[in-house]
Amino acid sequence: MATPCAEEDPLARYRSPLVSRYASAEMGFNFSERKKFGTWRRLWLYLAQAEKSLGLPITDEQIKEMEANLDNIDFKMAAEEEKKLRHDVMAHVHTFAHCCPKAAAIIHLGATSCYVGDNTDLIVLRDGFNLLLPKLARVISRLADFAETHADLPTLGFTHYQPAQLTTVGKRCCLWIQDLCMDLQNLERARDDLRFRGVKGTTGTQASFLQLFEGDHSKVEELDRLVTAKAGFKRSYMVTGQTYSRKVDIEVLSVLASLGASVHKICTDIRLLANLKEIEEPFEKDQIGSSAMPYKRNPMRSERCCSLARHLMTLVLDPLQTASVQWFERTLDDSANRRVCLAEAFLTADIILSTLQNISEGLVVYPKVIDRRIRQELPFMATENIIMAMVKAGGNRQDCHEKIRVLSQQAAAVVKQEGGDNDFIARVRADPYFSPIHEHLDSLLDPSSFTGRAPQQVAKFLKEEVRPALIPYQSMMGGKIELTL
């Protein structure tokens, strides 16, 4: 097949499915070139405004000209300039200067490329967190409602993926929520820990600005403070090389990778529960699970989350390696890698949160299936209760234990060797030895008596930890997610 012209046919060029297929428009824009280069121009404006306020010869007319052209970006011209200059920042300096001829002389005054590059990255990372946090809060809120609704519904617990003591559907969901609440706290901390790079010059010494202000250190410090405030940050990093420390990127991607681990665990549980036919993710009326097997109801949303969460978890390796090989004040081998991993981490996190919200808004529970599985396993779990009841009725503990051992082994053989149902209780009812407690067997086998404090734990956890954590996001809780499958 001949290679078609990509300019004539956009489908002839590879597009990342993170953007073309999955991510929200808001997160896609956050990492777009329009957002990036528009932010560069705003940073040049902030710098000029601050320099003017501190006495440099910059006119109101120059400032107004810059303000009027913040989004008037000739991307074609910028691309041509970059092709010629082999320098993206200078290409955009020239492009901005072209539409601001009066301000051309003072654009980028005293700055280095990382003034716009790194500071823009920090703004984009901050804004990315601000997009993710409400989404994560909505997922937690939906799951909290689900947990509250099913706080008392007994279900078979599993350890080692083998039947264990009973829990409740709501309590199991709270395990998911607890992990996500930790992620919420970690994302908030990572966002709030972000500082502005500020105006630091080529190697972080602020030498160019000290020269501009004729050795006035206080004005250089004030310039840094003013620009930092204009960009919406409370603090800037006190010391930098040419770039801000790449350990910051490690922190950012670490919390996102941790979120990926949480989502992967939750969606794996949902996939296993779907196999057990106890809980299913939403399944549309006309949705097709398999082209060959019409009966299939595949948990494809949860599978998508797991697939993308694995990608998200691996991305943290990039900033770890990048930070470790930055020589002295900086090397450029960070640049291409960061263009990929930072954007992909936030886009991927955005996708899995949107998908998980959609799942959590439509989880379907099948209580009768859950109850049937409990009834298959509960008789064996109830043996201790039966022994205690017999002793209270005057029986001998050792004799009772032996009787139950024999009957339970017989029942287990029916289940494992014959494929039948667990008939242990029927055997107990048929044995005259247990006649003193026959009328109490139903109460001894009530599943709710085996769930301990699970319902109370759910109520306390939701009230004291979950709901308070969601208070800052109350105004952003509306809206359901409709996925493009």
Swiss-Prot record:
The entry's substrate-binding residues are R21, Y22, R86, H87, D88, T112, S113, Q242, R304, R330, S335, R339
Relate the induction remark in this record: Significantly increased expression by estrogen. Rapidly up-regulated within 0.5 hour after extrogen exposure with a peak at 1-4 hours and diminishing thereafter.
Q: Which Pfam families match?
A: ADSL_C, Lyase_1
Q: What class of enzyme is it?
A: lyase
Q: In which tissues is it expressed?
A: Expressed in liver.
Coiled-coil annotated spans: none
Is Transport one of the keywords UniProt gives this record? Answer: no
* Catalytic activity entry: N(6)-(1,2-dicarboxyethyl)-AMP = fumarate + AMP; (2S)-2-[5-amino-1-(5-phospho-beta-D-ribosyl)imidazole-4-carboxamido]succinate = 5-amino-1-(5-phospho-beta-D-ribosyl)imidazole-4-carboxamide + fumarate
One GO CC annotation:
protein-containing complex
GO molecular function terms listed in the Swiss-Prot or TrEMBL record: (S)-2-(5-amino-1-(5-phospho-D-ribosyl)imidazole-4-carboxamido) succinate lyase (fumarate-forming) activity; identical protein binding; N6-(1,2-dicarboxyethyl)AMP AMP-lyase (fumarate-forming) activity
The protein's UniProt keywords, in alphabetical order, are: Lyase, Purine biosynthesis
Pathway as given in its UniProt record: Purine metabolism; AMP biosynthesis via de novo pathway; AMP from IMP: step 2/2; Purine metabolism; IMP biosynthesis via de novo pathway; 5-amino-1-(5-phospho-D-ribosyl)imidazole-4-carboxamide from 5-amino-1-(5-phospho-D-ribosyl)imidazole-4-carboxylate: step 2/2
EC number, as in UniProt: 4.3.2.2
Q: Which domain of life is it from?
A: Eukaryota
Q: Which GO terms describe its biological process?
A: 'de novo' AMP biosynthetic process; 'de novo' IMP biosynthetic process; 'de novo' XMP biosynthetic process; AMP salvage; GMP biosynthetic process
Q: Which residues form the active site?
A: H160 (proton donor/acceptor), S290 (proton donor/acceptor)
Q: Which InterPro entries match?
A: AdenyloSucc_lyase_C, Fumarate_lyase_CS, Fumarate_lyase_fam, Fumarate_lyase_N, L-Aspartase-like, Pur_lyase
Phosphoprotein as a keyword of this entry, yes or no, is no
What NCBIfam families does the annotation carry? purB
Function in brief: Catalyzes two non-sequential steps in de novo AMP synthesis: converts (S)-2-(5-amino-1-(5-phospho-D-ribosyl)imidazole-4-carboxamido)succinate (SAICAR) to fumarate plus 5-amino-1-(5-phospho-D-ribosyl)imidazole-4-carboxamide, and thereby also contributes to de novo IMP synthesis, and converts succinyladenosine monophosphate (SAMP) to AMP and fumarate.
Q: Which family does it belong to?
A: Belongs to the lyase 1 family. Adenylosuccinate lyase subfamily.
Q: How does it assemble?
A: Homotetramer. Residues from neighboring subunits contribute catalytic and substrate-binding residues to each active site.
Protein name according to UniProt = Adenylosuccinate lyase
Species of origin: Gallus gallus (Chicken)
